[in-house]
């Protein structure tokens, strides 16, 4: 079995995963660059009980520990859905102090922005999740007032990488690590508009992997495994 996105825990399975913990940590790192004085953050979580939600939340918590100038003022469940996120944020906003940033898990950004706008609250820096409506909103705000943020998420096309990993296993490769970490897809102020141009209305940014890219990903993870083994063996 080759799994992707979510995690299969059986040792015999292969797992193609994004470093979701780093993803959460990088959300706070980016906010720290733009908001050196810190402030209150609103966290929008994903589906409760999933490994992805736990990992991203853990990364966000680690980022806040490294940057104590920030504090999580409140946390709501957005379930990776714009409408759900908008309702959840709208419900909690009246009880919150000024929010300087919104950290989330992808797909919540546009809903959060709509909630702040409807409540006539000052727009915080909202981390986006690579969806077309989020990036389009970001583009509009950038043109209007120079709005700056960061966007990241797993690429739906990671399923193609899992396919090629399965093909390599069936082709007889015995050296493929059972845990394969691949980069998440991220955009910044300089390149998100180019990505937006290629995303259909209602869609999400993605990348389809080739066989060669899959082989490079496998080799990169093999090197990581070898380096960890070497480090462990070098310890007294």
Where are these regions (language model features)?
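Structured segments of extracytoplasmic/periplasmic soluble domains
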Residues: 4-7, 30-38, 63-67, 88-95, ...
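Stable alpha-helical elements in mature extracytoplasmic
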Residues: 23, 27, 52, 56, ...
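Flexible loop/hinge segments that line or gate small-molecule binding clefts
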Residues: 1-22, 26, 33, 40, ...
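Solvent-exposed loop/turn segments at secondary-structure junctions
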Residues: 1, 7-10, 47-51, 78-82, ...
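Hinge/cleft segment of the Venus flytrap/periplasmic-binding protein
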Residues: 63, 154, 163-236
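Periplasmic-binding protein-like
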Residues: 1-4, 42-43, 73-76, 96-106, ...
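Hydrophobic alpha-helical
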Residues: 60, 78-138
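An alpha-beta-alpha
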Residues: 25-70, 74-75, 166, 173-198
């Amino acid at each position: 079995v080759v799994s992707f996105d979510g995690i299969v825990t059986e040792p015999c399975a292969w797992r193609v995963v994004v470093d979701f913990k780093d993803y959460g940590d990088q959300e706070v790192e980016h906010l720290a660059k733009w908001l050196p004085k810190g402030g209150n953050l609103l966290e929008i979580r994903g589906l409760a009980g999933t490994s992805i939600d736990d990992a991203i939340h853990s990364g966000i918590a680690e980022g806040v520990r490294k940057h104590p100038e920030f504090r999580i003022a409140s946390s709501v469940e957005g379930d990776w859905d714009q409408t759900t996120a908008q309702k959840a944020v709208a419900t909690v906003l009246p009880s919150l102090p000024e929010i300087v940033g919104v950290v989330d898990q992808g797909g919540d950004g546009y809903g959060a922005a709509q909630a702040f706008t409807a409540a006539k609250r000052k727009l915080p820096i909202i981390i986006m999740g690579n969806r077309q409506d989020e990036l389009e909103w970001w583009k509009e705000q950038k043109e209007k007032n120079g709005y700056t943020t960061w966007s990241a998420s797993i690429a739906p096309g990671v399923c193609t990488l899992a396919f090629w990993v399965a093909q390599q296993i069936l082709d007889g490769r015995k050296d493929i690590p059972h845990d394969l970490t691949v980069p998440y897809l991220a955009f910044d102020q300089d390149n998100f508009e180019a990505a937006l141009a290629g995303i259909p209305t209602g869609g999400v940014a993605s990348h389809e992997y080739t066989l060669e890219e899959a082989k490079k990903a496998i080799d990169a993870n093999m090197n990581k495994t070898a380096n960890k083994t070497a480090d462990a063996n070098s310890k007294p």
